[in-house]
């Protein structure tokens, strides 16, 4: 039991049309938890997944049906089950560092010593044997991150730092991505149609994240949520393993 009545397709405080889902998979819930969904702690979801124990998320003071967290997603024919927005991101770019083995190690080992989590990472090869490395950290870690990079640049002998806190990360999550094509195309096309530029992209088997300007983040979340019809209940739902055995 919690102070919310279930798991939603996105944060209902950000998007009123967010829909409470009847069921969500362990893996989807873990991804959403890593993206800031505070409904369940990731450790509890990992424990439930390990022993295949369903979790029922519901409000402490309500009899309303909540959300079941289990092995299966809400539906098998929907590629995306949820979306998330993180606004407290900072973009860091280290420009003009030597394009040679050990450069990334020098930078990220200094950052790791500060116990800072690095998120999205892109490296581009520049001119004259130089490279540019971009990545994101949390806003609160930016000053410490810059200090760590400065130490690495002394060792590397060249390079300078640029940073911005005017960015936000939008992510879509869904087990169906592993089997359905066109998710990235729909997401990127939706953002382009809304005039929203993508600064960085990262993907996993069940997640796509993009970095956008913070002032466009709310509109990006709204258009993506609508493009994947997350406000609409699925026409078919997946039966749990227990229900399948009972019906067979």
Positions of PLM-derived features:
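C-terminal catalytic "cap/lid" subdomain
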Residues: 1-248
